[in-house]
Amino acid sequence: MIETTGLADPGPVAQTFFMDDEIAESYLLDSVLTLVDAKHAEQQLTDRQEARRQIGFADQIFISKTDLVDDATVSALMHRIQQMNPRAPQQRVNFGDVPLAHVFDLRGFNLNAKLDIDPEFLNAETHAHASPDNHDSHAGHDHAPGEACNHPHSQPHHHVHDDDVKSFVFRSDKAFVPAKLEDFLGAIVQVYGPKMLRYKGVLWMKGSDRKVIFQGVHQLMGSDLGPKWAPGEKKGSKMVFIGLDLPRDVFLHGLEGCLA
């Protein structure tokens, strides 16, 4: 276990496990855990980008010192964190009492393993809206929890923070053209890589009978062949991006342009 300082940027630490061959041969990065001080987190998240980066990178988030604030404060904090990183589970902790199963072997950087643990990854957990430029493409995006939406069931109940760390989802029930997607992702990473904290997905590629597992940290992006599509399984793609003020429309429309 590597414990960093409270002001550390997790990005360079995570990248070391992929860029340094000697380290990669001997060590596997399992996950990034973020401990949040409920008493001071709101101010820290507002004042320090490093704190927001730590939320964006996290695979698991622990909320401590909840006994020092009221339930409304904790609820608002957890809502804010969820807006920044909806894929990371949050858990209140009492004097560091955490089950080891919530700390080790989370497989945050092994999406193939995550598919075994969570086979519903491709299924929509929120409603999706068609993209504005092509309503027939069946490509779309999901609202991150707490994100503004015109539907009456999504009226916000918490103060809205304009944090620079945000997440968005692309999904489609059309196959990607491999060459187009490779070119687009390569260009996107060159331009926006420093702002792309974590991204991952399961892809349906034209001409392949297997899922493609895709993930990355900043400019480091990789993919592996996953399991075959099961008979009768609905094929599709889902990509989750977490980053610093990423141009959502550029990503979504660009990905649509890579579909068959």
Please provide the spans of the model-predicted regions.
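Short N-terminal micro-motifs specific to bacterial/archaeal maturation
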Residues: 1-4, 172, 242
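C-terminal accessory "lid"/substrate-recognition subdomains
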Residues: 57-63, 68-230, 234-237, 244-260
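Phosphate/Mg2+-binding loops and adjacent switch elements
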Residues: 1-102
